[in-house]
Amino acid sequence: MKNEKKKSGIEPKVFFPPLIIVGILCWLTVRDLDAANVVINAVFSYVTNVWGWAFEWYMVVMLFGWFWLVFGPYAKKRLGDEKPEFSTASWIFMMFASCTSAAVLFWGSIEIYYYISTPPFGLEPNSTGAKEIGLAYSLFHWGPLPWATYSFLSVAFAYFFFVRKMDVIRPSSTLVPLVGEKHAKGLFGTIVDNFYLVALIFAMGTSLGLATPLVTECMQWLFGIPHTLQLDAIIITCWIILNAICVACGLQKGVRIASDVRSYLSFLMLGWVFIVSGASFIMNYFTDSVGMLLMHLPRMLFYTDAIGKGGFPQGWTVFYWAWWVIYAIQMSIFLARISRGRTVRELCFGMVMGLTASTWILWTVLGSNTLLLMDKNILNIPQLIEQHGVARAIIETWAALPLSTATMWGFFILCFIATVTLINACSYTLAMSTCREVRDGEEPPLLVRIGWSVLVGIIGIVLLALGGLKPIQTAIIAGGCPLFFINIMVTLSFIKDAKVHWKDK
């Protein structure tokens, strides 16, 4: 009994270091917000200007890796001996569900405004050219390229899970073929896991920092409750308590149902926006934007603006590539888990086609709606952002639709459920990664899950206190740096082991 307790308890070497590091950083930030903002700007400038090119090359190389998997010697290899666990339709639906987070609703609604007001390639702000390239850049940042990189890592994790039968809950577990068991389970593996966990904690905190203002702004619109930092903190606290109650009372089934409701409601809300906003314009704009994407793709892939120094690729492309890098392991583990029994080619094609369709639908519908509202002078987005903040501007793009009260209730419920499931997933992932061993079918310890949800909530509040998008972008970029190297190591480890294991079969 004692031994079982020890097994399911925390793993000190990967529990306490991230906790201490993140705690100290939060304390230093809160202690002097102005100084923290100076540091944040310096870190953002250094990473994006000095190392931005590395993130761009990483994505390009991983794209070539995707083609190698699809058309190479492993294309027909099956990831596990069993038949696929889910039907193709259910599998794609689960992929779509993984895309409908509140952070995605945040960027999908407002991103196009930033691209049009500060466009790439030296275009005039708010010009016809800027509007033509605006959605094309969203399709680039949230299209086949990043999903191709995820599919490569998903194949790697599915290989370790279902072919090599490894119990992978931390990235160090996958590095045995590359660095040897001694190093993977020793100091080197511990350092890798700690970097992964610190980056993941900040990534989850930033997602919460994006999602919370949407909910509190909805509350202000619906109930007249003023949006303040204190209200943000209260809402985050309520979510943490709700998550703790769900876990303590064994209501995980309820959380899964909530996740399904989120997916169906996402379809409903997107369909509503598509119909009432202007379906013909949306389809025409999408078609035009795909053409613009294909025409400018080579330049977009390698665009650093080294001569013009306008800052667009650093502020957006490098930021988003870091965003994809930082979430790669967590998302790839999930996508690998639901892909048991599929071939390498099936997984790669299914992910790129299914997930690209999901993100393209979201960005096209929401971005087109925002552009229409600006062009028709229904909303003054710059003024809303300056006077009330980005979250209010996003809320107003939804409130401007017909049946505004019903629409706002739908959006409020969608954001609320999305954030509840986000916190639940955060606490679960971090608890699993910081425990010694959690057997299949078991849940990680309650207190560990609650503890991590509290810490993620604190980070969200700290980022909100700093104000603006720059702290959130910097947290992602800084966290993406170590994950950049870890993702490469996982990829190389898979290639090295597959050459031996799959060659013999």
Curated annotation (Swiss-Prot):
Lipid metabolism listed as a keyword: no
Transmembrane regions: 10-30, 51-71, 92-112, 143-163, 195-215, 231-251, 263-283, 316-336, 347-367, 403-423, 446-466, 475-495
Keywords noted in UniProt: Antiport, Cell inner membrane, Cell membrane, Membrane, Transmembrane, Transmembrane helix, Transport
Substrates-to-products reaction catalysed: 4-(trimethylamino)butanoate(in) + (R)-carnitine(out) = 4-(trimethylamino)butanoate(out) + (R)-carnitine(in)
Primary subcellular site in the record, as a coarse category: membrane
GO biological process terms on file: 4-(trimethylammonio)butanoate transport; carnitine metabolic process
Membrane topology (UniProt): Multi-pass membrane protein
Pfam family, one: BCCT
Protein location: Cell inner membrane
Record keyword Nucleotide-binding present: no
Molecular function (Gene Ontology), one example: (R)-carnitine:4-(trimethylammonio)butanoate antiporter activity
Pathway: Amine and polyamine metabolism; carnitine metabolism
Single GO cellular component term: plasma membrane
Described function: Catalyzes the exchange of L-carnitine for gamma-butyrobetaine.
PANTHER family named in the record: HIGH-AFFINITY CHOLINE TRANSPORT PROTEIN-RELATED (PTHR30047), L-CARNITINE_GAMMA-BUTYROBETAINE ANTIPORTER (PTHR30047:SF11)
Family designation: Belongs to the BCCT transporter (TC 2.A.15) family. CaiT subfamily.
Complex formation: Homotrimer.
HAMAP family: CaiT
Name this polypeptide is given: L-carnitine/gamma-butyrobetaine antiporter
Organism: Salmonella choleraesuis (strain SC-B67)
GN (gene name): caiT
